[in-house]
Regions:
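Short catalytic helix/loop segments, enriched in acidic residues and glycine
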Residues: 15-29
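Conserved N-terminal catalytic core of the sugar/cofactor nucleotidyltransferase
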Residues: 25-89, 133-134
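Short beta-strand/turn micro-motifs composed of small residues
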Residues: 2-3, 44-45, 89, 115-116
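Conserved core of the sugar-phosphate nucleotidyltransferase
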Residues: 55, 95-179
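A short, conserved beta-strand element in the Rossmann-like catalytic core
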Residues: 8, 93-95
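Active-site glycine-centered loops adjacent to acidic/histidine catalytic or metal-binding residues
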Residues: 4, 91, 168
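N-terminal nucleotide-binding beta1-loop-alpha1 segment
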Residues: 1-13
C-alpha cells in the first residue's frame, strides 16, 4: 500500500518516497518483501503518489487515493490478486524479511491483523494515532495484515520493526535511530 498523501509528514516528498536513512521507505518495504518467503509483490499506488508509481519496479494496481481502506478495497478487488493477500504499508522502514516470514508463519487461515501494544509505540516515541482495546489491552495496528476469507485473528507482537510507522518527521528520526 503506497498511495498515501503523507499530510502529517509535512514534506514535499511523496510519503512512500520519503527517505529514511537515505533510502525511500517504499524501497525498504519492497526489499523486506523480496527477502521473505513472499512469492509475488504488487504495489498499490494512487493518484496521490504519481512519482511512486513510476519509481517502482514491481507490478502496480492503481487505487483511487480515497484513503487507506478505500484503496485497500480497490486493490483487493483486482483480479490479479487472490486471497490470502499479505498487505504492507509503505511507511515501515524497519521491516525486514524475517519479520514478514514470522507474520506469514503466524497466519493460520482467514485474516490476520498484526498489532503492537500502544505502550510500545509511546515508549519508542512514535505516533500512535489509531489505538483500540483488544483482549483488555490497548493496541495499535501496524500496517501489516493478511487478508483472507474466513475468521479474523490478531497477532500481538512487541517487535519495533513493525511498531515504527513513519507518519511524522519525529517518527522518521526514531526510525533512523534503529536502522
Amino acid at each position: 500500500m503506497c498511495g498515501g498523501r503523507g499530510t502529517r509528514l509535512a514534506t514535499d516528498a511523496e510519503k512512500p518516497l520519503f527517505r529514511v536513512g537515505g533510502v525511500p521507505m517504499v524501497d525498504r518495504v519492497v526489499g523486506a518483501l523480496r527477502d521473505s518467503a513472499v512469492d509475488r509483490i504488487v504495489a498499490a499506488p494512487s493518484p496521490n503518489a504519481p512519482n511512486t508509481r513510476s519509481h517502482l519496479d514491481v507490478p502496480c494496481i492503481e487505487t483511487p487515493g480515497e484513503g487507506y481502506v478505500a484503496d485497500l478495497d480497490a486493490a483487493l478487488a483486482d483480479d490479479r490478486l487472490s486471497r490470502p493477500v499479505l498487505t504492507v504499508a509503505a511507511d515501515l522502514p524497519l521491516l525486514n524479511g524475517e519479520v514478514v516470514d514470522r507474520v506469514l508463519d503466524s497466519h493460520e487461515g482467514g485474516s490476520l491483523t498484526v498489532l503492537v501494544p500502544a505502550s510500545l509505540k509511546r515508549g519508542l516515541g512514535v505516533s500512535d494515532d489509531t489505538t483500540f482495546e483488544d483482549g483488555g489491552r490497548v493496541v495499535a495496528p501496524t500496517g501489516v495484515n493478511v487478508v483472507g476469507d474466513g475468521p479474523d485473528d490478531a497477532w500481538l507482537t512487541r517487535d519495533r520493526r513493525v511498531a515504527v510507522n513513519v507518519n511524522t518527521i519525529a517518527d522518521a528520526r526514531v526510525a533512523e535511530q534503529w536502522l
